[in-house]
Amino acid sequence: SDKKSGASAQKTSANLDVRYTSLRQPYVSYTSLTDRPGYLRLYGQESLNSCYNVSLVARRQQERHVQVETCVEFTPTCQEQMAGLAYMYDTGNFYLLVKTREEEFGFQTLDLKKSAKLRLIKSDHFDVEDVIPAISIPEEGPVYLRVTTIQEGLYAKFFYSLDGKDYQELAEVPTNILTDEQSEGFTGAHFGMYCHDMTGLRRYADFGYFEIVKARKEQ
């Protein structure tokens, strides 16, 4: 198992654990462990569907039954900014549990207002959709994100918490889109911390820890 092997375990280190990987570009170009000591800061770039510059720090899945958890602090200003937990195979096949900001229409005031939202997104061969309706969450403060694989890794459950103790289950999803057979590749599935900012302003997200533990097999 790997308990809190992210930023919180490396407060005095200028580099992440060598087991972390990135997409196409070195993660040093979009991360910092010193801008906010004790946290891994990711500066948002393009979306995970992009074949160019993506802000992702990930670890390969090595067990069928695992639980992955992180804590993110992020204050997006628009829906083009997202940050959170990624469970992915490649740029076209993934799940994202992310905090963002969306516009809502106020029927009483007849105007648009923006509010922080939590979204669970699925990309199946670049066909992107929301798994569940977006959930309203506080504008400020941390949000805790968790994914647990079950049934020999054939499915995964996503959860969130606002206090790190009381977790709410969001959805159970199939993981077939994250396999070599479905994606016609050989990279294997990865779990990661992720941030994007399609406005080009490089809005950042702070991750307090990244924890991977071997989960008990469900009976």
Segments the model singles out, each with a brief description of its role:
Residues 1-219:
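Extracellular glycan-recognition regions
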